[in-house]
Amino acid sequence: MYDYLKGLITRITPEYIVLEQKGIGWQLNTPNPFAFRTSAMEQQIYVHLHVREDAQVLYGFPNLDQRELFRKLILVSGIGPKGALAILATGNPQQVISAIEREDETFLVKFPGVGKKTARQMILDLKGKLGSLLETIELPSTEDELPLFGVHPYKHELEEAILALAALGYSEKELEKIRPLLEDNDKLETTDAYMKQALQLLLKLK
């Protein structure tokens, strides 16, 4: 069983990153690929190997807490790896854990593929079992805390974010509703920043 991979991130797409290690490029599906950056320095990515009948898929996470929450989410009936990635992509697992503990179905059904039945199942399966994660996960929750990396605000950053959100399962109708709000926000400079702001807006739609 793999625990983590350490290498150079050589490619970032809307669905996955490629981590090169000793001449081998590992394709890692991640919640938000644009939270990573290509770099000449080695990076350590925690991984989860998901085995299906037709494929073996590696999922990558920047820290152990995200991987642990992912593993708990995919144990819930009705939530597969893609659904778990969409939930984690908000960049704020605290919101998700808090919603489960409060039995807030209204919040949980805002994620792609999560209906009332699945939201109820999440609460039944996970309530009271995520306390340690809630204490250790500390991620940005407001726009002012989003990290900006000094990338010029070209439109392709927004388009990359839209593609990544579509890959997570958000509909074209939902994305078109928030696009004007993203286009008018001159504080957003990177694809990662667009992603995080877009996800917060999407959670307010329903």
From Swiss-Prot:
Region (Flexible linker): 142-152
Alphabetized SMART domains for the sequence: HhH1
Transmembrane segment boundaries: none
Keywords associated with the record: Cytoplasm, DNA damage, DNA recombination, DNA repair, DNA-binding
UniProt keyword annotation of Glycoprotein present: no
Sequence segments annotated as region (Domain I): 1-62
Location in the cell: Cytoplasm
Ranges for region Domain III: 153-206
A cellular component annotation (GO) from this entry: Holliday junction helicase complex
GO molecular function, one term: ATP binding
Primary subcellular site in the record, as a coarse category: cytoplasm
Source domain of life: Bacteria
Region (Domain II): 63-141
Pfam name, any one: RuvA_C
GO BP: DNA recombination; DNA repair
Quaternary structure and interacting proteins, as annotated: Homotetramer. Forms an RuvA(8)-RuvB(12)-Holliday junction (HJ) complex. HJ DNA is sandwiched between 2 RuvA tetramers; dsDNA enters through RuvA and exits via RuvB. An RuvB hexamer assembles on each DNA strand where it exits the tetramer. Each RuvB hexamer is contacted by two RuvA subunits (via domain III) on 2 adjacent RuvB subunits; this complex drives branch migration. In the full resolvosome a probable DNA-RuvA(4)-RuvB(12)-RuvC(2) complex forms which resolves the HJ.
Similarity comment text for this entry: Belongs to the RuvA family.
Domain notes: Has three domains with a flexible linker between the domains II and III and assumes an 'L' shape. Domain III is highly mobile and contacts RuvB.
UniProt function note: The RuvA-RuvB-RuvC complex processes Holliday junction (HJ) DNA during genetic recombination and DNA repair, while the RuvA-RuvB complex plays an important role in the rescue of blocked DNA replication forks via replication fork reversal (RFR). RuvA specifically binds to HJ cruciform DNA, conferring on it an open structure. The RuvB hexamer acts as an ATP-dependent pump, pulling dsDNA into and through the RuvAB complex. HJ branch migration allows RuvC to scan DNA until it finds its consensus sequence, where it cleaves and resolves the cruciform DNA.
Record protein name field: Holliday junction branch migration complex subunit RuvA
Organism: Lysinibacillus sphaericus (strain C3-41)
Organism classification: Bacteria, Bacillati, Bacillota, Bacilli, Bacillales
Encoding gene per record: ruvA
